[in-house]
């Protein structure tokens, strides 16, 4: 009986470790198994609507704007309005087909959102990774270092030269989602405050 119990315990332990991909280095006070459950639940969210604010601090320029973000699986519609970006800007598209519309300046197309924002708004933002970070998840295509809080949610994330601090979560429709987070890049600090989360599972 004891032998069987030990075997089952070992299997459960190995299964829990298998859920941690080799790309993730995990630390902190949270429970790795609970993190995997949370990660799997949040990963199923492939649609959302967000209303909030974004603030950016850089050596030569700073500003803030209201943020609207509509996500429908791989399609996104991100809108900024306010001093940041010189008025209003709208970023829409899906991987490989991105459109940026800037008030009083026109429409611009590119294959990556990062290139468009860098060229037209002088913003060096990792939009492709933000699709994951905004949900409190690491992007799956590169290595990351994760620090868990006592609730087994992300407290800190290091990935692709960026550091993300998750300062507050909110419970919305049964999902624990980031409400306030700060991103630190090279000579850039970004603050995101989400005032309204509307998560969706569209693939069901």
Swiss-Prot record:
It is found in: Cell outer membrane. GO terms for biological process: lipoprotein localization to outer membrane; protein transport. A lipid is attached at residue 17 (N-palmitoyl cysteine). Keywords: Cell outer membrane, Chaperone, Lipoprotein, Membrane, Palmitate, Protein transport, Signal, Transport. InterPro entries: LolA/LolB/LppX, OM_lipoprot_LolB. It is a lipid-anchor. Transmembrane segments: none annotated. Residues 1-16 form the signal peptide. A lipid is attached at residue 17 (S-diacylglycerol cysteine). One of its GO terms (cellular component) is cell outer membrane. Belongs to the LolB family. Monomer. Plays a critical role in the incorporation of lipoproteins in the outer membrane after they are released by the LolA protein. NCBIfam families: lolB. This is Outer-membrane lipoprotein LolB. It comes from Ectopseudomonas mendocina (strain ymp) (Pseudomonas mendocina). The gene is lolB.
